[in-house]
Amino acid sequence: MLCLPVFIILLLLASPAAPNPLQTRIQSNLIRAGPEDANMKTDKRVISGLLAGILVPLIDAIMG
């Protein structure tokens, strides 16, 4: 009779400790992926497009 409450308490303690399978899979994928896989290089076309989008209207406004 004493085993049942002990079993229930152990079951309640063990349930939150179980890892989320999706979370562990994402974490393992992130660990395996290196920074070179993340494409951290800045694309020059993006920067030039942003600068052109900002500078051209600014120069047009200054010139009149």
Swiss-Prot record:
Compartments where located: Secreted
Residues with PTM Methionine amide: 63
Disulfide bonds, paired cysteine numbers: none
Keyword DNA-binding annotated: no
Organs and tissues of expression: Expressed by the venom duct.
Signal sequence range: 1-19
Molecular function via GO: toxin activity
Chain residues in the propeptide: 20-43
Keywords, sorted A to Z: Amidation, Cleavage on pair of basic residues, Neurotoxin, Secreted, Signal, Toxin
Gene Ontology terms: cellular component: extracellular region
Family: Belongs to the conotoxin T superfamily.
Additional comment: The mature peptide does not contain cysteine residue.
Name the UniProt record assigns to this protein: Conotoxin VnMLCL-042
Lineage: Eukaryota, Metazoa, Spiralia, Lophotrochozoa, Mollusca
